[in-house]
């Protein structure tokens, strides 16, 4: 599979449909899916530990117009944007057809349960085998209890929705306890959308790469992240500079 690197973080050059097929391929070990966006990559640019964490993914999907723009600027264009929530939705459609079991982990109190209710209405044949909230102590007995609950539900697919880098760290630190799961995907705030707590951007805004603007308009506290997005875009090397730094 072709990949590029942004600030030392690998990004797979893949379509959403191919990503779903790849994520569900039976290989004997879990396919771990991360979805780096501009804010995540900006943090990784300043913190090698975060870059190394992102690089442990089996599949790394370009989430956001900023990532596509940066890849284009470097002369390494990507096939398409694969937003985490769109990937998750496509994965759920495939899970419903194949009879796969899904576990939802993350969100505040009741969020995963409401997300499950909403998804069952949309996908009547989908098997959501279990849910758990994301605000638990990620060490000690409470963490072991969550892991035990997940394993007892026997999911084929696990969605972990706690935000970056908490969700990615938790997955990698506990991967040895989740070996029976086929696909583990970190999907940020997807549960809040599926639960109906947060509205997603209109389709036309997503198509033209303005979903980030919608989020900031709906959640003004996100405006504080705007300088980080600008910094990410500013530091992306031009094509000539990138090639000089990465000779064949």
Predicted regions and their residues:
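Short glycine-rich anion-binding loops that position phosphate/pyrophosphate groups of nucleotides
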Residues: 37-41, 162-167, 190-191
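Conserved beta-alpha
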Residues: 72-149, 153-154
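Proline-aspartate-enriched helix->loop->beta-strand connector
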Residues: 150-164
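Short, flexible loop segments at boundaries between secondary-structure elements
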Residues: 133-138, 181-218
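A short helix->loop->beta-strand "cap" motif at the edges of active sites that frequently abuts
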Residues: 30, 100, 179-182
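Short Gly/Thr/Asp-enriched flexible loops that form oxyanion-binding sites at enzyme active sites
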Residues: 116, 168-177
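A transmembrane-helix-recognition feature enriched in membrane-embedded lipid enzymes
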Residues: 66-72, 200-248
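N-terminal nucleotide/polyanion-binding subdomain common to many enzyme families
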Residues: 1-86
């Amino acid at each position: 599979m072709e990949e590029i690197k942004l600030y030392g973080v690998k990004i797979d050059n893949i379509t959403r449909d191919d990503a779903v097929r790849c994520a569900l391929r039976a290989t004997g070990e879990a396919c771990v899916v991360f979805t780096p966006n501009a804010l995540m990559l900006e943090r990784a640019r300043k913190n090698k530990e975060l870059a190394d964490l992102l690089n442990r993914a089996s599949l790394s999907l370009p989430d956001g117009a900023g990532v596509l723009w940066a890849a284009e600027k470097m002369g390494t264009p990507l096939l398409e944007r694969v937003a985490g929530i769109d990937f998750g939705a496509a994965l759920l459609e495939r899970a419903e057809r194949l009879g796969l079991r899904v576990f939802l982990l993350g969100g505040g109190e009741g969020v995963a349960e409401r997300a499950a209710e909403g998804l069952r209405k949309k996908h009547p044949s989908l098997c959501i085998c279990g849910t758990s909230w994301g605000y638990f102590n990620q060490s000690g007995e409470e963490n072991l209890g969550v892991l035990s609950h997940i394993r007892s539900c026997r999911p084929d697919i696990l969605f972990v929705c706690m935000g970056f880098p908490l969700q990615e760290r938790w997955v990698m630190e506990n991967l040895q306890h989740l070996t029976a799961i086929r696909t583990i995907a970190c999907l940020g705030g997807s549960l809040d959308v599926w639960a109906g707590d947060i509205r997603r951007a209109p389709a036309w805004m997503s198509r033209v790469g303005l979903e980030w603007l919608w989020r900031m308009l709906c959640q003004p506290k996100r405006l504080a992240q705007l300088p980080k997005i600008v910094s990410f875009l500013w530091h992306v090397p031009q094509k000539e500079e990138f090639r000089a730094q990465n000779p064949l």
